[in-house]
Amino acid sequence: MEAATMAWTAAGVGMALVYWFVWVMGAAEVKGKRAVDLKMGSITNDKVKDKYTQYWSFFRRPKETATTEASAEKVPAFVDTFYNLVTDIYEWGWGQSFHFSPSLPGRSHREATRVHEERVADLLQAKPGHRLLDVGCGVGGPMRAIAAHSGSNVVGITINEYQVNRARAHNRKAGLDSRCEVVCGNFLSMPFSDASFDGAYSIEATCHAPRLQDVYGEVFRVLKPGGLYVSYEWVTTSLYRADNPEHVEAIHGIERGDALPGLRRQDEIASIAKEVGFEVLKELDLALPPALPWWTRLKMGRIAYWRNSLVVRVLTMLRIAPKGVCEVHEMLYETAQHLTRGGETGIFTPMHMVLLRKPVESK
Ligand SMILES: C=C(CC[C@@H](C)[C@H]1CC[C@H]2C3=CC[C@H]4[C@H](C)[C@@H](O)CC[C@]4(C)[C@H]3CC[C@]12C)C(C)C
Ligand SMILES: C[S@@+](CC[C@H](N)C(=O)[O-])C[C@H]1O[C@@H](n2cnc3c(N)ncnc32)[C@H](O)[C@@H]1O
């Protein structure tokens, strides 16, 4: 073979390899987000590293972030930064629903996710014509599943503008934009009128609130009397021991890597709900047996993580992805280890479910 032909062949093979590596290996968990499209929300490429450093220094000591009023007030802004940094990586590596669900034998992760979301609609007894509120809606995976399953209309609220745009685009694509609406705002002070929703839910979102009373109080205000509210809460369980260094490391790791101003205890949730005026109808940790572990999806993905971190490195080198993505990806990888540890030891659950009702006689 002539040298020129050999060079062209080598170049062709090289190009094919890059194509395979980036477009095929870097394909999305759920089609729609590819590694080559990774952005850092509304942060411009030159600011990603700085924003990540700011985020990290704020949440490095998670418990301290909620202790003074001044730092608690900054939490929503840093949560917004966090979601600018992670939203695309979450969509790429996990899908459009940013939460966990118990594994289901013989069913895919996608199906298990949907079942966990439809359970919310069933608990709320949601019907066509109902107006539901999704508190901390992400890019709207649960909202679309719940609207499709129940026939209800859903309004989602998220602090992160980039997520609002992603969610609206997904709603249009799914043909659900006439029944699913997304608003950018703070769930600690919501831009909705009193008694304007038939039902409300929050899936793994209220853990970002420095004081649960504030978000539950707002949900109480916007619900109609008799309206139901379901929440899946991130909490430490009764197995957590504050004098066990391994427990403390796992919980701090979860808080740091998930923008949490300090996890609450499982036994605090119902009393906070009562404090703001709710009746507690049901309370159950959905992670308890016979439910199968929610963390197996994180564990089974070791090879996928390795592949993803390679993809992210190559894309950063090629300047397709912004500088700082590798650091964010590494942080998420470590967080996954802490979450797995939290699940395996039973000291943490991301699905402590409460079903609450605003009393019929309340204003
Ligand atoms: C409710 C919250 C988010 C829960 C989960 C959706 C996310 C928690 C940790 C995330 C991930 C960890 C490892 C990532 C991996 C290194 C990467 O290659 C692909 C994406 C991950 C799997 C990512 C996906 C989302 C999580 C599982 C919190 C924030 C309250
Ligand atoms: C882990 S995501 C869960 C998203 C969605 N519930 C799901 O399961 O896909 C948490 C969500 O809460 C939102 N959030 C956190 N703090 C908020 C605040 N103060 N106001 C409004 N949204 C907030 C985030 O923007 C994000 O959309």
From Swiss-Prot:
Gene3D superfamilies assigned: Vaccinia Virus protein VP39
Membrane topology classification: Single-pass membrane protein
Annotated catalysed reactions: 24-methylidenelophenol + S-adenosyl-L-methionine = (Z)-24-ethylidenelophenol + S-adenosyl-L-homocysteine + H(+)
Indicate the transmembrane segments per the record. Answer: 6-26
**What EC number(s) does its UniProt record assign?**
2.1.1.143
Single GO BP term: methylation
Please provide, alphabetically and separated by semicolons, the GO molecular function terms listed in this UniProt record: 24-methylenesterol C-methyltransferase activity
Keywords per UniProt: Lipid biosynthesis, Lipid metabolism, Membrane, Methyltransferase, S-adenosyl-L-methionine, Steroid biosynthesis, Steroid metabolism, Sterol biosynthesis, Sterol metabolism, Transferase, Transmembrane, Transmembrane helix
Q: Where in the cell is it found?
A: Membrane
Under InterPro entries, the record lists: Methyltransf_11 (IPR013216), MeTrfase_SMT (IPR030384), SAM-dependent_MTases_sf (IPR029063), Sterol_MeTrfase_C (IPR013705)
| Gene Ontology cellular-component annotations | membrane
Q: What does this protein do?
A: Catalyzes the methyl transfer from S-adenosyl-methionine to the methylene group of 24-methylene lophenol to form 24-ethylidene lophenol.
Q: Which family does it belong to?
A: Belongs to the class I-like SAM-binding methyltransferase superfamily. Erg6/SMT family.
Name under which the protein is recorded: 24-methylenesterol C-methyltransferase 2
- Give the species this sequence originates from: Oryza sativa subsp. japonica
Recorded name of the encoding gene: Smt2-1
